[in-house]
Design a protein with these regions (language model features):
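Extracellular adhesion/glycan-binding regions together with long Ser/Thr-
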Residues: 419-431
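Ordered hydrophobic segments in well-structured contexts
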Residues: 112-113, 248, 254-256, 272, ...
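Residue-level detector of beta-strand structural context in well-folded domains
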Residues: 244-245, 271, 361-363, 415
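Accessory, solvent-exposed terminal regions and/or long lumenal/extracellular loops of proteins
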Residues: 308-411, 428-513
Length: 513
């Protein structure tokens, strides 16, 4: 909505608003906006907003664009609007939620923010990851963008997909555009590959709700933003500052969105990512990287650089549909190492959480002598939680296990175990929310990177180019007697674009541990 326009005669609420303001509705005189007038403020909410809220409107988008001046010197109308909307929304006992423009330092205390009417361009896309994470420096932790760009620019399938990928790993995911019949941001307005890829990522966003909600509580409780620059936890590392578009996405993931075009020869886009100390696993490709350095990631259109730290535990909802209720089927992606995670849940609407009305499920993972152990301490049973919940534990970097044992309250549980797709998945029957669970995998085979030769072959197979030339180069590389010789031959035989791909991402000659 655009409050600066006041209330006009064509609006449904005009007659009631005019009478309340002491005006004759028949004159159709505009009711001018005045945030300093108590009478207008009450009329504004009582006649223009409350009736729609009674019909089901959950929150308002305040699109104020008319500057900082009001009849009261020093009072910014947008600040006042955010303040009054925030207070008014609490009258029903629900949590106040508004979406609004940036009103200066400190204005994060009320709304979810949005970055205005951005152009549809690669340049704008490239700036937004940096903008989002560094906004945390002034406390603005929940920010949103018009995913896909708002106006002008150009229609570009590849750019759209990369923007959607950024949106999925942003605080707020919101497709939006100007009122243009040819600029809709729905996936079906793009080519088949872009549509399918965008759909996949949008579904992933819905699966991530348990993780996002837990991180929201983390922000509330501890002041840690969902998107934080890499230098927050690595202040002495120069690489953390140079990786402008890299950021931690909650406690478990590191993200660096793709913001450059795909190379036509390699069919991938290059992104340079600085990884902190430790082992990092690409959640889309399964490739493992050593930290404390910058790596070059080459992403096809359907992938992007997202890394799980060692010991990461990531909750995902497997419930189908568009519901935001606490899930009945919950999957945890688990990465080997030592780590913990607190899954936070509440009713999602009221302020009962302030009085302790919430449930926290604690999980921890640890590496044992010849396996891995996952422990789950069930949360409180609440009316807003399912009576029983089915858990699925996906050990994402465990290829196989000789045996799996799952216990609850001293009793062994029947479970389904599969090792398809290079990961071990343990599915449990529906259980009470409060039930403790202990899962142990013995004799495990851990995920490893492919041999360098195989990685090079796979990368070169997808390269665009003349087949005979590709084959001649590959046959020379195939004859290399060891990895050092292979590395040397790659540097000599291929051009800069292909060399970067083979050395930094496609063949991943620098990524093995």
């Amino acid at each position: 909505m655009h409050p600066a326009l006041g209330i006009r005669s064509f609006e449904n609420c005009y007659d009631a608003a005019a009478r309340t303001m002491g005006l004759d509705p028949a004159e159709k005189k505009p009711i001018e906006f005045d945030i300093t007038d108590t009478r207008f403020i009450n009329t504004y909410f009582d006649t223009a907003h409350h009736p729609y809220e009674e019909e089901g409107v959950d929150f308002w988008w305040i699109d104020w664009q008319q500057g900082k001046k009001s009849k009261l010197p020093g009072l910014d109308p947008l600040w006042a609007l955010n303040h009054y909307h925030y207070l008014d929304r609490q009258r029903s006992g629900k949590r106040p939620l508004i979406l609004s423009r940036y009103a200066g330092i400190g204005s994060h205390r009320y709304p979810l923010g949005f970055s205005g009417d951005t152009f549809m361009s690669w340049r704008v896309l490239k700036f937004q990851p940096y903008f989002t994470s560094t906004a945390s420096n002034c406390g603005y932790t929940w920010w949103s963008h018009d995913i896909g760009g708002h106006c002008f620019g150009r229609h570009d399938d590849e750019m759209y997909v990369r923007w959607v990928q950024l949106g999925v790993f942003s605080p707020i995911m919101r497709l939006h555009s100007s009122n243009d019949p040819l600029s809709g941001k729905e996936p079906w307005n793009y080519g088949w590959e872009a549509e399918m890829t965008a759909e996949r990522y949008l579904r992933l966003r819905h699966e991530l709700i348990p993780y996002l909600y837990s991180m929201n509580y983390r922000t509330h409780k501890f002041g840690r933003a969902l998107c934080e620059p890499l230098y927050y936890d690595n202040p002495e590392c120069e690489g953390a500052y140079k990786c402008r578009n890299g950021y931690m996405f909650g406690s478990e993931l590191l993200v660096c969105p793709v913001t450059s075009k795909i190379n036509k020869k390699t069919r991938r886009a290059e992104t340079r990512v600085w990884l902190p100390k430790g082992r990092w696993t690409d959640v889309f490709t399964g490739k493992i990287y050593r930290g404390s350095k910058t790596v070059r990631i080459h992403s096809e259109l359907n992938t992007m650089p997202v890394f799980a730290r060692e010991g990461a535990i990531i909750p995902l909802s497997l419930d189908e549909g568009n519901s935001c209720k606490n899930p009945t089927v919950l999957k945890f992606k688990v990465y080997r190492g030592n780590g913990s995670f607190s899954l936070y849940e509440d009713d999602g609407e009221t302020n009962g959480f302030k009085d302790g009305d919430f449930s926290i499920t604690e999980l921890s993972v640890s590496e044992t002598e010849n396996g891995i152990k996952l422990t789950l301490c069930g949360g409180k049973e609440k009316d807003y939680l399912p009576l029983k919940r089915q858990y699925v534990f996906e050990f994402s970097d465990i290829v196989s296990a000789e045996s799996v044992r799952v216990m609850s309250g001293g009793e062994k549980l029947d479970c389904s175990v599969t090792d398809a797709g290079g990961r071990v998945t343990v599915s449990l029957p529906p259980m009470e929310i409060s039930a403790p669970i202990e899962a142990e995998l013995y004799g495990v085979t851990v995920l490893k990177n492919k041999p360098k030769r195989e990685a090079v072959r796979e990368a070169m197979t997808k390269f665009n180019g003349i087949n005979n030339l590709k084959k001649r180069r590959y046959l020379i590389l195939e004859k290399a007697k060891d990895d050092a010789a292979l590395l040397s031959d790659v540097r000599i035989l291929v051009n800069s674009a292909l060399r970067s791909e083979l050395l930094g991402g496609g063949g991943d000659l620098d990524y093995t541990l």
